Amino acid sequence: MQVQVSLTIEIAASASLAQMEHQVQDIGQQAMREAFKQTIRQGEDQQQACPHCGAKQRRLEGTVRRVIATLFGRVQVPRRRFRCQGCGRSFCPANALFAELAGGTVSRPLQEAAWLAGCSWPYRAASAALKRLSGADISAEEIRLLLNRHGQQRAAQQQAEAERVCSAPAQPTEAAENAEPLLLVGGDGGWVGSREQRGGMEGKVAVVCAQVADLPMPTRSSTFSWSQRGARRPPRQRHRLVKRRYVATFGPSGHLGHLAAAAARSVSEAPPRHVVLLADGAQWIKTQQARHFPQATCILDWAHLWREVRHAIAVAARAKPLSVGERDYQFSLHRSWLWYGQVDQAVQGLRSLATGLPAEALEAITNLEHQRPWIGSYEHWRKLGYPVGSGMIERAVALVINRRMKKRGMRWCRPNATAVVALRTDLRNSDWILPQRLRAFP
């Protein structure tokens, strides 16, 4: 088929470059809509035979209007209706082309663009962005319905595939030199507003990484300069997680466990020599760790641990009361004990501080005893190259949940929230395959 569309553009002589661009874009979209209608018309001309009896004698009986939303705007297609002279039945040749729409009005390319825009921005912003960038005329409600339907299907596919991978027998252990040296797993939750329950609901996120690369160190001059004020400290080595996968769900924690275990098998071609799991010590994370990563080295991230212990010392210092110097000494002492894994001494120190104080000061002691298996020597872990902070998983929660789902006034149903994070994890995982300079989310 050959389709020819002629263009005539009238542009004022005083038009600016931006005005010229907008006018050319508008006329180009009109030409694309006209070419689309002509292509459908030629497709109708090529189908001469009746789909019921195969006869080629037919009579035109008018047209039936059909509106299709495309990437370049809404197109009104006059479908021609014919009457077969052999069997007497009517048919529309264009119906075969519209079968893939399944009774809808949105084309497949526009659906894919709506999925991408809807899982990246609020629905109204996504509708406006598509209209501005490509001329697509699709409402925010249509984007929401398309995203929820496809996202729920994708979430079910991810879960079924993860359960299939986890139920399959593990690959035989290969030679140690072919195995990944380290597999990092991080898990955490992110809270969003809920339409179903007060207080919100928790979305569960995990990130799995099999390769860590050092970032280039910034240049540092040892000479004095008036343009650089403040303390001159040597830069710290920063790292980037190269081979990673995100998984997330708003369903039960068991779903995330299967997704994380399947992601661990996908990022590591060979069984890893060692697995390190970093989390905040939530009970559901411990349950999934015991089920899917029983041999992992479990690390309670340092930020959560020290925040709670520091708060307990501050409460005790205010109630005693302790002077600022004595309080800072307790901070330094307990921080040193916990950093080097001397948990028993830290518990004894907290007990001596909390003597005669209310239960608020004793919560840190209970938490330390409860999290004892996950607390070790952070100095030793740091020397081994293990992450001890929560930056890896906190960043994952921010990318997967917070940036899209924690806007002002947003409240979610659990199935729809799961649909959004299923598509967002697909977007992030496919984006990380690209080189760093080509990524949309570096």
Q: Language-model segments: which ranges?
A:
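Short, cysteine/histidine-rich loop/knuckle motifs that typically chelate Zn2+
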Residues: P51-A55, G86
